[in-house]
Amino acid sequence: MLKRDMNIADYDPELYAAIQEETLRQEEHIELIASENYTSPRVMQAQGSQLTNKYAEGYPGKRYYGGCEYVDKAEALAIDRACQLFGCEYANVQPHSGSQANSAVYMALLNPGDTVLGMSLAHGGHLTHGSPVNFSGKHYNVIPYGIDEAGQINYDEMEALALEHKPKMIIGGFSAYSQIVDWKRMREIADKVGAYLFVDMAHVAGLIAAGVYPSPVPFAHVVTTTTHKTLAGPRGGLILSNAGEEMYKKLNSAVFPGGQGGPLMHVIAAKAVAFKEAMEPEFKEYQARVVKNAKAMVAQFQERGYKIVSNSTENHLFLVDLIDKNITGKEADAALGAANITVNKNSVPNDPRSPFVTSGIRVGTPAITRRGFTEQDAKDLANWMCDVLDNINDQGVIEATKQKVLAICQRLPVYA
């Protein structure tokens, strides 16, 4: 018999210590990695529920195991809420991650060797959009597109490449692009060559749910997203579509049995909670503040003489180009990390340095906004970061900045 008062602290002190250290790190560090966020205790409660015990291969009402009548209810809630949140007819809430959701789309719509048009990783795309080290680049003929000198997606280049190479699928979406994407133009290009338009909106799903960033759902044949990042739910994936029953059957089959076995029912329940939270008025207010905080930080970096890729941001993230400062992204990442400010090194367009070193950093505001940062707090933070970057080898400046970080983290805890 299992006792409900069993706990990790008593049984596994080594693991418990690591968990406590990570908990403290999250409270005492400012999180600026654009793909990270803090999920709610309600989401974590669902993930720690007894739904973790249930195997449920198949879909609601069509399972391969018995005893699924209650997990069916949980999955149906998640599906209905996802459809309501994003305005679509179809949702598959079973993908374990965004990458697995993307893999399912490839499997559903393409054959190995088919031609795909995807955003270059070096210009802001994602590994699963055709990087040669990823399955997408290994199994498909990928033609990359990028951004122009002004830092905007080059739609004319995209159209020319589409007309030349006749891709079967065009991929929209990004991991490091700060501007508004013209989904309508992308669909027009796809239609000209008879291609599917597949959009990976993982980074901006929360902004889209709140109506502060344009939705690709009315234009794309298929849309995928993660359920964490700006959406602030559990780590997982989601597929959406309005393209009709034939498409829905292909997508369902590609997820199960094509790429996965049993779904993670405790995570699906957590997705249902997160989707409900995303329909609340305060979530919409939060997402609007995310963008305002990003814009405030950009303005402060520019005032301090730092170059911002695309010269602005219209979402939750931006890239700081450090080439002119003769600082590597790796150095900036390490120095800011020593001041308890977490960012990630990131390649910038036409970066002369390797992806392991880079010439830029990516900055995102979902997490700081979640813990209550105002626009003034965001400006102050950008100034502190510039202080560190201007004095990258000065331990005194780094330590003084760390003390400021600890003070604001104490004032604005993640979990009060």
Swiss-Prot record:
Essential cofactor(s): pyridoxal 5'-phosphate
Catalyzes what? Answer: (6R)-5,10-methylene-5,6,7,8-tetrahydrofolate + glycine + H2O = (6S)-5,6,7,8-tetrahydrofolate + L-serine
Q: Where in the cell is it found?
A: Cytoplasm
Q: Which EC number(s) does UniProt give? A: 2.1.2.1
- Keyword presence, Mitochondrion: no
Amino acids binding (6S)-5,6,7,8-tetrahydrofolate: 121, 125-127, 245, 354-356
According to the UniProt entry, where is the signal peptide? Answer: none
Picking any one GO biological process from the record gives: tetrahydrofolate interconversion
Q: Where is this site: Plays an important role in substrate specificity?
A: 228
Cite a single Pfam family from the UniProt record: SHMT
> Where is this protein primarily located?
cytoplasm
Which chain regions cross the lipid bilayer?
Answer: none
UniProt keywords, alphabetically: Amino-acid biosynthesis, Cytoplasm, One-carbon metabolism, Pyridoxal phosphate, Transferase
Look up the record and name the pathway of this protein: One-carbon metabolism; tetrahydrofolate interconversion; Amino-acid biosynthesis; glycine biosynthesis; glycine from L-serine: step 1/1
Q: Which residues carry this modification: N6-(pyridoxal phosphate)lysine?
A: 229
Q: Name one GO molecular function term.
A: glycine hydroxymethyltransferase activity
A single Gene Ontology CC term: cytosol
Record text on subunit structure and interactions: Homodimer.
> Which NCBIfam families has this protein been placed in?
PRK00011.1 (NF000586)
Q: Do you know which HAMAP family this protein is assigned to?
A: SHMT
Q: Give a short account of what the protein does.
A: Catalyzes the reversible interconversion of serine and glycine with tetrahydrofolate (THF) serving as the one-carbon carrier. This reaction serves as the major source of one-carbon groups required for the biosynthesis of purines, thymidylate, methionine, and other important biomolecules. Also exhibits THF-independent aldolase activity toward beta-hydroxyamino acids, producing glycine and aldehydes, via a retro-aldol mechanism.
Q: Which family would the database say this protein is a member of?
A: Belongs to the SHMT family.
**This protein is called what?**
Serine hydroxymethyltransferase 1
Q: Which organism is it from?
A: Vibrio cholerae serotype O1 (strain ATCC 39315 / El Tor Inaba N16961)
Q: Which gene encodes it?
A: glyA1
